[in-house]
Amino acid sequence: TTERAKIAPILTSEQAFDDQTFAKPQEARVTHLDLDLVMDFDAKSIGGTAILDVLATEGANEIVLDSNGLRISAVTDEAGNALEFNLGETVEGKGEPLTIQLPAQKLERPAGLAEGELAATHRIAVEYLSAPEAEALQWLSPEQTAGGEHPFLFSQGQAINNRTWIPTQDSPGIRQTWEATVSAPEPLNVVMSGVVQGDPEAVDGNRRDFRFEMNHPVPPYLIAIAAGNIEFRE
């Protein structure tokens, strides 16, 4: 028998190029995304913090993410220290490059990794808010739903629309694992394209937190969310 080859994401190859992303994955790429978000139906926005694990090459001092209409309020390192960032000019149909200075301090290499196995070198946190006109998010009023009592939200990230509500490297070749905690007003339920982690947890302000996890690296456009008067049946 032959050992099954490990296939790396296409954009780790120098020959591959995606002209619909601002990212430079040969220098620094996102490997994991941890979202802590609050859903606001009145403002038609999702906002909070995206914590990104980054694998950077030796000598790389910045990472470029994709954004489209995101309102970036702060970027910090793991210790909460501010990091320099710049939101570039908008390119029609593509959005803006979000360039972030990487922390000087690198993450410790986890114990038990095999020789040659790669691990994240940096961790950064981006505080942000999506715009009401975010193309990936469809906000429906109660009158637009079958029940007529509660609003409804669903996302459509393909092909490059998730950058309108998630600051990451929005390219199908830059696959990422992810996890998310999403706060929504009662009695709405939240679903995502990941594995549910426990029951919803009640929090202040008549809201509940929902948790999800995806341990298999996926293209960013496959991160999906919906919320509304959703029922679960066996």
Task: Write out the residue ranges for each language-model feature.
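Acidic/His-enriched low-complexity segments
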Residues: 1-234
